[in-house]
Amino acid sequence: MTCQLARFYGLPLRSSGVCAANVPDGQSIWETSNSLWAAVQSGSNIIYHAAGWLEGGLIASPEKFIMDCEIIQQIQRYMDPEIFSTDTDSIAISAIKEVGSTGHFFGVEHTQSRYENAFYQPFLSDWKNYEAWEAAGAVWTPERAYKIYQQILN
């Protein structure tokens, strides 16, 4: 209700992320992700405690900060107005006509011109399949986040 009142009266709105987890694990990610989605979709102007928090703010974790930055980047990409564009070119009416019911979209210029940047590219998440991930050392997300954190410091 607070968000609705703020929007109605044109007032700025602040909200915050939530994370009660004690370590940068699955619980910490879903708590942060869910609270950030709610904060962003409510129309908050500023979101406090959005990254790096554990144990309700009693612990500041560099690894969790890196992990949360990727969540924020993914949300930011999803909320990009281009994602929701419904103009004729964006929804590919000409490509749909060109492909018809028997073709495929990979050979169409509309797809080719957008393919490189149409998808979010994570800087932390590992999108390899299990076998490839295992062959590469089976490095868990917090470990990868720690390496990125160390690279930033150095």
Tell me the role of every PLM-derived stretch:
Residues 63-154:
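Catalytic-core signal marking the mid-to-C-terminal active-site face
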Residues 1-71:
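Glycine-rich anion/phosphate-binding loop at the beta-strand->alpha-helix junction
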